[in-house]
């Protein structure tokens, strides 16, 4: 008669509670357990839905109006979602009508603001619907604290990151901030990205931009994203540059911790 043994401790259990990443899913024979397989299929469906979800700017326009912020609704050169996904280059430029509309806005209200803010659906309108309003509030508060002037917020359907260069150039802004839905992941269909470019001009490459990514409830908080943005903007204006020459060195104090008394890190796979 064999002696019963205690099942081995699942060393990954604690990590599974800390991350939505697909780790230690287990197995059923040579495949995944049914629950894990169904969760994967659901996440994949949510990511696909986020890519194809139509951008609805009306709620954001209403919020901006309540805050006393002017907004302009524009469209990229990609006429629909199908063309947007097939022709990334069209998502980087305004349509002719949108460009003319923005020129008219500059002629009437004047240009030369410190900051132009662009909100574009990108590859996840869901991210914009959920998080753009809160990040715009962070940007407005930062601008008020620093004394920076703001151009009207431009809301762009079928837009990609580089479209901010054209918007910033037409508005004659010192810098442009683009809030855009990031490519959905299998655990993050609603991740918002923020891109900063100093002296925006059509033709800039990604090397001219700074990125703050994964802004969402389960990722980077609005407050921390605003803190990073404040540092990058102050340095961009001081040094008159952005992109690869500007590194994010914003302080990140660990609240409630005493570094002197912290225990040495241990291997979570080893027994207690």
From Swiss-Prot:
Record's keyword annotation contains DNA repair: no
Any Gene Ontology biological process: amino acid metabolic process
MF-aspect GO terms: cobalamin binding; ethanolamine ammonia-lyase activity
Principal place of residence: other
Subcellular location: Bacterial microcompartment
EC number(s) stated in the UniProt entry for this protein: 4.3.1.7
Alphabetized Gene3D superfamilies for the sequence: Ethanolamine ammonia-lyase light chain (EutC), Ethanolamine ammonia-lyase light chain (EutC), N-terminal domain
Reactions catalysed: ethanolamine = acetaldehyde + NH4(+)
GO cellular component: ethanolamine ammonia-lyase complex; ethanolamine degradation polyhedral organelle
Co-factor binding comment: Binds between the large and small subunits.
Pfam families noted in UniProt: EutC
InterPro entries reported in the protein's UniProt record: EutC (IPR009246), EutC_C (IPR042251), EutC_N (IPR042255)
Record-listed adenosylcob(III)alamin binding positions: 161, 182, 211
Necessary cofactors: adenosylcob(III)alamin
Keywords: Bacterial microcompartment, Cobalamin, Cobalt, Lyase
Name of the top EC class for this enzyme: lyase
Pathway annotation from the record: Amine and polyamine degradation; ethanolamine degradation
Family named by the database record: Belongs to the EutC family.
Assembly notes: The basic unit is a heterodimer which dimerizes to form tetramers. The heterotetramers trimerize; 6 large subunits form a core ring with 6 small subunits projecting outwards.
PANTHER family the UniProt entry points to: ETHANOLAMINE AMMONIA-LYASE LIGHT CHAIN, ETHANOLAMINE AMMONIA-LYASE SMALL SUBUNIT
Function in brief: Catalyzes the deamination of various vicinal amino-alcohols to oxo compounds. Allows this organism to utilize ethanolamine as the sole source of nitrogen and carbon in the presence of external vitamin B12.
Listed name of the protein: Ethanolamine ammonia-lyase small subunit
Naturally occurring in which organism (per UniProt): Xanthomonas campestris pv. campestris (strain ATCC 33913 / DSM 3586 / NCPPB 528 / LMG 568 / P 25)
Lineage of producing organism: Bacteria, Pseudomonadati, Pseudomonadota, Gammaproteobacteria, Lysobacterales
Gene: eutC
């Amino acid at each position: 008669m064999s002696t019963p043994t205690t099942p081995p401790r699942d060393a990954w259990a604690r990590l599974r509670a800390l991350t939505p990443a697909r780790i230690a899913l287990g197995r059923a024979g040579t495949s995944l357990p049914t629950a894990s397989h169904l969760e994967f299929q659901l996440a994949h469906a949510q990511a696909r839905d986020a890519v194809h979800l139509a951008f609805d700017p009306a709620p954001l326009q209403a919020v901006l109006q309540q805050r006393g912020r002017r907004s302009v609704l524009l469209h990229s050169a990609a006429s629909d979602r199908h063309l947007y996904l097939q022709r990334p280059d069209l998502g980087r430029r305004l349509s002719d009508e949108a460009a003319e509309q923005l020129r008219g806005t500059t002629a009437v209200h004047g240009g030369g603001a410190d900051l132009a803010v662009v909100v574009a659906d990108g590859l996840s309108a869901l991210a914009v619907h959920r998080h753009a309003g809160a990040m715009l509030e962070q940007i407005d508060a930062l601008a008020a604290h620093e004394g920076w002037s703001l151009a009207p917020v431009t809301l762009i359907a079928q837009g990609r990151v580089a479209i901010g260069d054209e918007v910033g150039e037409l508005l004659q802004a010192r810098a442009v901030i683009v809030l855009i839905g990031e490519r959905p992941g299998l655990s993050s269909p609603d991740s918002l990205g923020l891109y900063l470019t100093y002296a925006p001009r059509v033709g800039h490459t990604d090397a001219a931009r700074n990125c703050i990514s994964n802004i969402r409830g389960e990722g980077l908080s609005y407050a921390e994203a605003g803190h990073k943005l404040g540092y990058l903007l102050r340095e961009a204006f001081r040094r008159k540059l952005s992109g690869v020459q500007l590194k994010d060195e914003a302080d990140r104090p660990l609240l409630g911790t005493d570094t002197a008394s912290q225990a040495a890190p241990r291997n979570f796979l080893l027994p207690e």
